[in-house]
Amino acid sequence: STPPEKGPSEEELSELLARLVYSTMAAMPNWQIVSESEVREVGQSIPPGADMARLRKIGEMVYADALIVGRVERYRERIGNEWGAKSPASVAFALNLIDVRRGDVIWSARFDETQKALSENIFALGQIGQRGIRWLSAEQLTQEGVRKAVGELHQILVRGTAAS
């Protein structure tokens, strides 16, 4: 028998979340975004760690007002295909927007979903228009969550109701 497929590493998941957040944000109007590669390059010149001082330093070096930081909490791939899944995709992640000057979190979002069959969740009828009647991969589910979170952040910032 073949060994079970090993899922993506923590680093690969971080890169996936960063790529999805960046591409989603870059597609929206009214804000300037520092390229993912520039942030990564600057980040390599600063000693590793996830502390606020390091994040603020990266933000200052790329002349950003704020940084968005993500953390993948769960990433389980669907077992089966889009028309029949033995086990659905399950994804959880958190995003925090950090004010570079003050060093505090000014917005956060959390996405946590395990896709359910329509027969299990009649309230999912509203999602059919967006997803169709199919089982999403973990990456597709992550993309959907990123779109929701970034869309919410964009509305808040464009309306100017975020803390300043």
Outline where the language-model segments fall.
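Hydrophobic core residues within well-ordered beta-strands of beta-rich domains
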Residues: 66, 89-91
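C-terminal/domain-edge helix-coil "capping" segments
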Residues: 58-62, 85, 98-164
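Conserved beta-strand and immediately adjacent loop positions that scaffold enzyme active sites
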Residues: 92-96
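Short, glycine/charged-enriched secondary-structure capping and boundary segments
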Residues: 13, 83-86
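N-terminal segment of the mature soluble domain
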Residues: 1-73, 100, 104-108, 144-159
